[in-house]
Amino acid sequence: MSLEKASKAAIVADNARGQNDTGSPEVQVALLTARINELNSHFKAHTKDHHSRRGLIMMVNRRKSLLSYLKGKDATRYRDLIVKLGLRK
């Protein structure tokens, strides 16, 4: 259920603020979003996989807390990230 190395590197490069940035909230949220989307497709085939569902809920909550942190620190970066990832309507 993890991302492939190439796709993870592409996500990091696309959302990084600097050259060696892998830990900024933008990168972390983008990686979590990709993993969440992967798990959503997994649950379409495996509806009774409750163990993985717990992991999904933990990832969603982690993403939520990172987004609220980013919103408090810099609202423009938050809005740009939301639009870029298509998280809100």
From Swiss-Prot:
One GO CC annotation: cytosolic small ribosomal subunit
Q: Which domain of life is it from?
A: Bacteria
Which example biological process does GO assign this protein? translation
Cross-referenced SMART domains, in alphabetical order?
Ribosomal_S15 (SM01387)
Q: Matching InterPro entries, A to Z? A: Ribosomal_uS15 (IPR000589), Ribosomal_uS15_bac-type (IPR005290), uS15_NS1_RNA-bd_sf (IPR009068)
Question: Which CDD domains does the record match to this protein?
Answer: Ribosomal_S15p_S13e (cd00353)
- Which keywords does this chain's UniProt record carry? Ribonucleoprotein, Ribosomal protein, RNA-binding, rRNA-binding
Under the heading PROSITE patterns, the entry gives: RIBOSOMAL_S15
Q: What would you give as a GO molecular function for this chain, any one?
A: rRNA binding
Subunit comment for this entry? Part of the 30S ribosomal subunit. Forms a bridge to the 50S subunit in the 70S ribosome, contacting the 23S rRNA.
Task: Fetch the HAMAP family from UniProt.
Answer: Ribosomal_uS15_B
* Function statement: One of the primary rRNA binding proteins, it binds directly to 16S rRNA where it helps nucleate assembly of the platform of the 30S subunit by binding and bridging several RNA helices of the 16S rRNA.
Instruction: Please give the family membership noted in the entry.
Output: Belongs to the universal ribosomal protein uS15 family.
Protein name stated in the entry = Small ribosomal subunit protein uS15
| Organism annotation | Janthinobacterium sp. (strain Marseille) (Minibacterium massiliensis)
